[in-house]
A protein has these predicted regions:
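Polar, enzyme-active/binding microenvironments
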Residues: 1, 39, 89-263
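Intrinsic low-complexity, repeat-rich intrinsically disordered segments enriched
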Residues: 1-119, 183
């Protein structure tokens, strides 16, 4: 390890740490850059109450790093991608999960119609249940708009609308799927603009953010992963998951596990 012992000052002063301060009062309430002896800024700033890390030249994926004695990363701040990763798995610290699903759903409106899946924790009372509704269409993708008043059961919107309060990024969506007959089940995740001013509850500007398709059967439970079309979804959007029995009206069950992080 380098030593100052028996060395001339001009051979080691660049290795001495100092704060960016013209006076000689030392560390105080003002946060100042930590510098080398020749006045070059480091990424660290100090005061008597604060420690700040800010890149001096370039953002990097390891601007701040805490690791174990053995070198395993425990906490890492990535200023290139605006991420904080934690734990041995180095998972984004703002990672969350959202579950959606349908159980033994009967597509009584006919084959090939898109049906929204339940997104929120709601309880059904009496004979009420989530029923089919052909309003979402039977095209390749679900409808991009919704007139709430045209729904068979508009109250279902409370169960199927996932309203975002923050900007999010989708990381991965996995599914489980089963059908009473051998059928192709198509699945989508859409985001819409929500009307909160005039036609309250109506949706517009629908965009597909993820999709999947699986050959489901009655004797198997298929697991798979969605293809992400567009990962970022902005705050105040309504997110809806859909399932579609492509060629049959047999009952089916699906489960979506949505891994995402807040931006």
């Amino acid at each position: 390890m380098p030593s100052f012992l028996s060395k001339a000052f001009n051979t080691y002063f660049n290795r001495i740490a100092q704060i960016d301060q013209s006076s000689n009062s030392g560390v105080d309430a003002t946060t100042r850059r930590l510098q080398t002896g020749d006045g070059v800024n480091t990424s660290i700033s100090l005061s008597d109450d604060q420690l700040t890390v800010k890149p001096n030249n370039d953002d990097t994926t390891t601007t701040f790093n805490v690791s174990s004695k053995g070198g395993t990363n425990i906490l890492e701040v990535d200023t290139t991608n605006s991420l904080v990763k934690a734990g041995v798995s180095q998972t984004n610290a703002l990672t969350l999960y959202k579950e959606m699903g349908l159980y033994e759903f009967s597509p009584g409106g006919g084959a090939d119609y898109h049906n929204p899946v339940i997104a929120n924790n709601v309880g059904m009372q009496g004979a009420e249940s989530i029923t089919y509704d052909t309003i979402w269409g039977n095209g390749t993708d679900p409808a991009t708009t919704l007139d709430l008043s045209a729904m068979t059961d508009p109250e279902n919107s409370v169960a199927i609308f996932w309203l975002l309060d923050s900007n999010i990024t989708l990381d991965q969506i996995t599914y489980l799927a089963r059908c009473d007959n051998s059928s192709t089940i198509n699945m989508h995740l859409f985001a819409y603009d929500l009307d909160i001013s005039s036609n309250h509850g109506d949706l517009s500007n629908g965009v597909v953010h993820a999709n999947a398709s699986v050959a489901a059967t009655s004797t198997t439970l298929k697991k798979g992963t969605f293809t992400l079309d567009t990962a970022n979804i902005d705050a105040n959007k309504v997110v809806i998951g859909f399932a579609q029995n492509e060629s049959d009206t047999a009952d089916y069950s699906v489960h979506f596990n949505i891994k995402y992080h807040i931006r």
